[in-house]
Regions:
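Conserved class I S-adenosyl-L-methionine
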Residues: 1-37, 51-52, 70-73, 146-152, ...
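C-terminal alpha-helical "lid/dimerization" subdomain adjacent to the S-adenosyl-L-methionine
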Residues: 19-21, 133-189
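Nucleotide donor/acceptor-binding cores
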Residues: 39-41
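Class I SAM-dependent methyltransferase SAM/SAH-binding core
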Residues: 43-91
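A short acidic, Gly/Pro-enriched loop at the edge of an enzyme's catalytic core
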Residues: 90-101
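A short SAM/SAH-binding and catalytic strip from SAM-dependent methyltransferases
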Residues: 101-113
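A short glycine-rich, Lys/Arg-flanked "PGG" loop and its adjoining helix->strand segment in the class I
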Residues: 115-127
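C-terminal lobe and adjacent flexible extensions of AdoMet/dcAdoMet transferase-like proteins
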Residues: 191-196
């Protein structure tokens, strides 16, 4: 992640409670899915202010973020099964096959190189490990025009308004297990993948 993007998210940290409130229904579904699985090692990339941390019921969680300020806030929600680290998801400092589960909650469209992020996730996941991606995805309906119109502003806030998951080569190495759509326009989705 570039210094400019990193700096932006440090400053943006004060607005995360509002963002979390807006995204709560989606995140509730995400954690319903995650918590149904057997206890395992879970990596939360872009843990942000740690709002998700209390929602993990049984997993050993490692949360990473590039924002020191966000991690400082997250540390107040810390509990003994969570390890928080300052790290870039596009350059993970973990060995191969370390995690049973990886969560990307509204992260993949804000990193500089989504392809590199997914490659790193593939590397650190164990065989049969699960990847959970909760994000907006540019749909093939009228909202596509909104995404395209929003591109210039989106760049200023370090966000890819136009985002197609199928354009990522590495995602094709995973098997899509489930797709959950939110709202009538299906702008937000939860995609659950499995590493072979």
């Amino acid at each position: 992640m570039s210094r400019q993007t990193h700096s932006f998210y440090n400053k943006f940290s004060v607005f995360y409670p509002l963002v979390d409130f807006f995204l709560r229904p989606q995140k509730t579904r995400l954690f319903d899915e995650v918590n149904q699985l057997p206890a395992g090692n879970l990596l939360d990339i872009g843990v942000g202010n740690g709002a998700n941390l209390p929602l993990y019921k049984k997993h050993r969680v490692t949360g990473i973020d590039t924002s020191f300020e966000m991690l400082s806030i997250a540390s107040k929600r810390y509990h003994k099964q969570v390890r928080l680290l300052l790290m870039n998801g596009e350059d993970l400092l973990f060995g191969d096959g370390q995690f049973d589960y990886v969560v990307l909650s509204h992260v993949i469209a804000v990193v500089d190189n989504p392809e590199q992020l997914v490659e790193e996730v593939f590397r650190v996941l164990k065989p049969n490990g699960r990847l959970f991606i909760l994000n907006h995805f540019t749909p093939n309906n009228w909202l596509k025009q909104v995404d395209f119109a929003f591109r210039i502003f989106a760049r200023m806030v370090h966000f890819k308004s136009v985002f197609y998951i199928h354009e990522l080569t590495t995602i094709r190495r995973f098997k899509l297990l489930k797709e959950v759509r939110f709202g009538s326009a299906s702008y937000f989705k939860l995609l659950i993948y499995q590493k072979p």
